[in-house]
Amino acid sequence: MSSELMFNYTFSWPAGPKDVILTGTFDDWRGTLPLVKTAKGNFEITMPVKLANKDDTFQFKFIVDGVWCVSDSYKKEHVSEGIENNFLQITDLVETQEVAGASRIPEAGGLLCGKPPRSAGPPSTSNRKKNKRNNKKRRSKLKKKSTKNNKKSNESLDDNEEEDGVTGTTTEDVTGTSREETPLAEPTNVSKEAPGNFHILPIDQSADTTQSNGIIGGPGPVLVPNPGEIKEFTEIRDVDARELNERLNKKEEVPEPVAGPIVESSVTEKSPALPQADDLIVETKEMAHNVQELTPQVEAVTPLINEPEPLPTPEAQISIPESSKVEPVEGSLQPKLVEKRESTEGVSDGSKKVENKAKKDEEVFTLDPIVNKAPKLPLTDEQTAEGRKSPAVSEEKEKKKKQEKGSKEVKRSETSKEKKPSAKEVKKQTVKAPKKQTASPLSSSTEEPKKKKTGFFGKLKKLFK
C-alpha cells in the first residue's frame, strides 16, 4: 500500500478582488484552480491535499487579479532567490477534519457531500411472526395425541399453555432493531483511509470579465438602474371595453364601392328630367291621345290579315325554281338503299343458281309414283310478235338504262369514298345473307324444276345482272 496521506482542506481569501486563483505544487504552478465567490463576498474552495509522509509540506500561492500574492493567514516559507510561498503541514490538516463520510466538492464552492441522516421507522414485527408459527406447530402435535386419550390431552394442553407463558418472549423484552436505537459510528481518523483522487478541471486565466453575483438562494428580482426611461413602468392606460369595441366596429363597417356609386350616378343624372306630380297627369292625357290616333291604323291592318291568301297559279308553279339543296340529299340517300338491295339480290341469285345446278346433277330417287308431265306447247304468232318489238324502241330503252346505270355507279363511287363500311356493317351484311336450303329427298321430288325464260324480259334481266 502507498504511504501517501490525503486530507480535505478549505482555502480562503477575503472579499475585495474580482478573481482569485489557487496554484502550487499540485498543478506545477500553472494556476488552474479558481476560488469560488460566496454570498459574503469572500473566496473559498475545498480540495484534497496529498502528503507523501508526515514530514512533507504542501506549498501553494494565490493569484489575485493577475498578481501572484502570499496570504498572511497561512504559514510562509522563504525559498531561494527571494521567493516566498505559503505551506501546510500534517498538523494543520488534522485539526480541520470533520465527521467521517462527509466531503466537500471543489467545483460546488466547498459544499458538503455526505451520507443522509437515518430516518426513524416502525419497529420490526419479525419476532411476533416467529412466535406465532411455533405455537401453531405445538398445538397441532397436541391435538393428534388427544384422539387417544381426551383427558390426557386436556391436561397436556394446560401444561403447555403455562409453559408458553413462562418461556415465551414478548415484544417488550426483545431487543430493539429499529434505526432509532442503533447508535451512530464513532468518528475515526480520516488519515488512515485513502479516499479516491479528485479530478481538477483547468480554467482559462484570461477570463477577467466574468462576474459572480453573491445572491443567497439563487437568482432573485431584477433591479433596473434606469426605471424612469422605460415606458412600461410609467404608462398606465384606462380603456373602456365598450367604447373600444364601438370604435373598432365603426372602422370595420366601410361601404363597398363596387355597384352602389355606379347606380346612384346614373339615377342622379336622370333624376332632374323626371316630372313632378302635376306633370304626370298631363302625360297620361297625351298618352291617351296617342292611343286614339294609332287605333285606325290597326283597324286598317286587321282586314288584310283576315283575307284569304290567293292561290298560286300554274304559271307561278312553273316559275318556282327547285331548291339546289335537295339534290345532294337525294344522291346521298339513294345509293345506300341500292347497295343493300343489290347485296341481297346477288346472294339470293347465286344461291338459286347453285341449287338449280345441284338439282340437275343429282338424280333423285323416290318411292312416289311417276307422273307424266304435259309437253310444252309451241308459241303462237301473236306471242312471237309481242316478243319481237320494234328495234328502235328497244334501243332507246337500252340507252336510257345504260345512262341510269352510269349515274348510279358515279353516285356509288362518291358515297363509297365519303363513307367506308365499318366492321359492324360488314358483319350485318354477312348475317343478312340467306342460308342455303338443303333439299330433302321427299320435297325435291315433288318440286318441279323452274323454266328458263328466253323472252325479251329475260334478256333485260340478264343485262341488269
UniProtKB/Swiss-Prot annotation:
Cleaved in the vicinity of position 160 to give an X-DNA-binding N-terminal subpeptide and a non-DNA-binding C-terminal subpeptide. Belongs to the CRP1/MDG1 family. Residues 156-165 have a biased composition (Acidic residues). The keyword Phosphoprotein applies. GO terms for molecular function: DNA binding; protein kinase binding. It comes from the Eukaryota. One of its GO terms (cellular component) is nucleotide-activated protein kinase complex. Residues 166-177 have a biased composition (Low complexity). This is Cruciform DNA-recognizing protein 1. The modification Phosphoserine is found at S153, S156, S271, S319, S343, S394, S440. Residues 107-227, 247-274, 298-465 are annotated as: Disordered. The keyword ATP-binding does not apply.
